[in-house]
Curated annotation (Swiss-Prot):
The gene is rodZ. CDD domains: HTH_XRE. Residues 155-243 are annotated as: Disordered. One of its GO terms (cellular component) is plasma membrane. Cytoskeletal protein that is involved in cell-shape control through regulation of the length of the long axis. Residues 176-214, 221-243 have a biased composition (Low complexity). Residues 1-111 are cytoplasmic. It is found in: Cell inner membrane. Pfam families: HTH_25, RodZ_C. One of its GO terms (molecular function) is DNA binding. Keywords: Cell inner membrane, Cell membrane, Cell shape, DNA-binding, Membrane, Signal-anchor, Transmembrane, Transmembrane helix. This is Cytoskeleton protein RodZ.
């Protein structure tokens, strides 16, 4: 009778109450139980209060309760009914497995995306290369056109230069003809002398001899007078050279030094072309005209320009490798 009453009383007690009573009978504290089971004191307290922590799986909780029961000498079979209520087993949630075909489909999609990315990259690179080539070709054609124009202008200048000496020669021949025919007026004098004397033939021959002598003297005199004129001509050269060197003092003078072959065209404010053509390596060019100047340079890297005594910056054209087109303004004149 007493055994049945004790069994009913044990069934009435919960798992936590039975474990706490057994611990107290052994004289153990919650701290001692936690140290022996390697648990937290809060976990031991939750077990005795029949609480199931939300952050603790039911499998671990059932294991802790069994360890606690063995520690306080409580049969595990008596705690099984209470364990089902306090820590029921829960079915584990298993994530559905993805099929191999899904992964293959995703991999195929990623492959198409990568191929499209490479295609776009190749198109961009191709368009960039085509744009650069067209720009470079246009620059080369422009340089060739300007060079052809300058060559045509140089040929025209040569043709005009060859025709000028012909005119000069004609003028010279016209100028020298009167000098050579200047002694001609002496002939009427000879004829007059012949009619006045009316001497025999030997006398006339002597008269002719005397007439010829003055004509030779006149030719010698003309040659002698022409010689000082020829000697005086070089004395005028220093004056002309000084006149050519004088514009170098112009504050708007344009000085260019060439380190390589370069096509160049320089125009002043009046539209006059001061220079148009090809300059060779190590060449120098000094120009003077009415500012501002307009310059076209086929190879900016091959020329060094000084204007008003200061170097002209061509770095922006050199970096882009383009034909340089620039205008050099006139120097402001100081107030007097």
């Amino acid at each position: 009778m007493n055994t049945e009453a004790t069994h009913d009383q044990n069934e009435a007690q919960t798992t936590g109450v039975r474990l706490r009573n057994a611990r107290e009978q052994l004289g153990l504290s919650q701290q001692a139980v936690a140290e022996r089971l390697c648990l937290k004191v809060s976990t031991v307290r939750d077990i005795e209060e029949d609480k199931a922590p939300s952050d603790l799986a039911s499998t671990f909780l059932r294991g802790y309760i069994r360890s606690y029961a063995r520690l306080v000498h409580v049969p595990e079979e008596e705690l099984l009914p209470g364990l089902e209520k306090q820590a029921p087993l829960r079915a584990a949630k298993v994530a559905p497995m993805q099929s191999f075909s899904l992964g293959k489909r995703r991999k195929k999609r990623d492959g198409w995306l990568m191929s499209f990315t490479w295609l776009v990259l190749f198109v961009v690179v191709g368009l960039t290369g085509a744009w650069w080539w067209q720009n470079h070709k246009a620059q080369q054609e422009e340089i060739t056109t300007m060079a052809d124009q300058s060559t045509a202008e140089l040929n025209a200048d040569k043709d005009s230069g060859q025709s000028v000496p012909l005119d000069t020669g004609a003028v010279t021949s016209q100028d020298t003809t009167p000098a050579q025919t200047a002694p001609a007026p002496a002939t009427p004098v000879d004829s007059t002398a012949a009619t006045q004397t009316q001497t025999p033939a030997p006398t006339a021959a002597a008269t002719q001899n005397t007439v010829v002598a003055p004509s030779q003297a006149n030719v010698d005199t003309a040659a002698t007078s022409a010689a000082p004129a020829a000697t005086e001509t070089p004395s005028a050269l220093p004056t002309s050279q000084a006149g050519v060197a004088a514009p170098a003092a112009d504050p708007n003078a344009l000085v260019m030094n060439f380190t390589a072959d370069c096509w160049l065209e320089v125009t002043d404010a009046t539209g006059k072309k001061l220079f148009s053509g090809m300059q060779r390596k190590d060449g120098n060019l000094n120009l003077t005209g009415q500012a501002p100047y307009k310059l076209k340079i086929g190879a900016p890297a091959a020329v060094q320009i000084q204007y008003q005594g200061k170097p002209v910056d061509l770095s922006r054209f050199i970096r882009t490798n383009q034909v340089a087109r620039l205008t050099l303004n006139a120097e402001p004149t100081p107030a007097q």
